[in-house]
Amino acid sequence: MRFLHTADWHVGKKLNGFDLLAEQHDAFLKINQLAKDYKVDAVVVAGDLYDRSVPSEEAVEELNKDLIRMNLKEGWPLLAVSGNHDSAVRLATGGAWFKATNFFMHTTVAQAIEEPVTLGDTQFFLLPFFGLQEVRNYFGDPEIRDLKTAMARIVAKMEEEFDPDRTHVLVAHFFAAGSSHTDSETQTEVGGLDAVPVDLMAPFDYVALGHLHNKNALQAPRVKYAGSPLKFSASEVNLDKGVWIVDTQPFNLQWVPLEPLHDLVKLTGSFDELATVEYASHYQEDDFFVIELTDTAPIPDLMNKLRHYYPKIIALSRVNKAADQSHLAAPAQDLENKDPLALLSDFYHQVTGEELSDNQRQWAKDALLAAQKEEEG
């Protein structure tokens, strides 16, 4: 059979405060079209359907439309697991109902082991993001203390359910040993329980992973991250985004890129080079920008000036950070003796070219006082 492997949709996510629902809607329409173009038999979503465990109404509406389009309108079986950003309990609501339309949403270890999904020549095991306590409870073994042991027990139990006449695919959401991550996954998110050694997954013919946003995060021929369909942080600016098309018999793997509605673009140059209508005209106004300046002198109100040309700046830095901060240099003794509020005020002025307002100054005083009290116990 042939299926499409995608993951880490993060519906409702914002990119440094900028809403992404329009970009996500466009990406899902394109995924839907790819599924039609490649005549897939099923669609796999390997976790993190939502960006938050309690998503916004707009995010829920968007995901519902996308799932209905794929499952009810196009008729593709959907195989999905909950990720660490999802609420397993909320996603599980309606599970029995979904199953009647070939929408399989697994949110527990018990489901992953006891309810493999057979479609055509393939048996799918759908393993959600899990905590060690859930695995201890399932096996009745309090000695399971790390992810490697937990996964070894889970995979061994899954093997007992293998149909020898079928291909076996694991759909999961975790951090695999040897993977690299990007800034849109924090250490706690990717590290969570530590890592799963790749060799533990050897019994499976293919492992469709979610959790990391880079398709190249792991170099294993049959263990793949799909990555996210959009760029979700400055560190992802050069990453390819797309989906895997997987054929089971004979096995074949094809990467198909997705063209974003609005791209995340990195610009490097001096302020005078970048802050012109001519330079900005090479890009869509609604693109997202990571800007790296080569200037060394301070530029008052820098961000606002750049946003006149590039409204959606998500990150701003200098090529020469040491030179950038040279105008802020002061003897260590002077810094130690200076009032924290004065330091903050100086920094704010250097960055924005403006003075703190009365409200900002009062907020800073309150925050500094609270921090001091907490430090003193």
Where are these regions (language model features)?
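N-terminal active-site segment of His-dependent metallophosphoesterases
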Residues: M1-I68, G75, N359-A370
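Divalent metal-coordination and catalytic microenvironments
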Residues: D8, F28, V43, D48, ...
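Short, well-ordered beta-strand micro-motif
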Residues: P116-T118, I245-D247, E292
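A conserved active-site cap/scaffold subdomain adjacent to cofactor or substrate pockets
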Residues: V198-D199, D205-P260
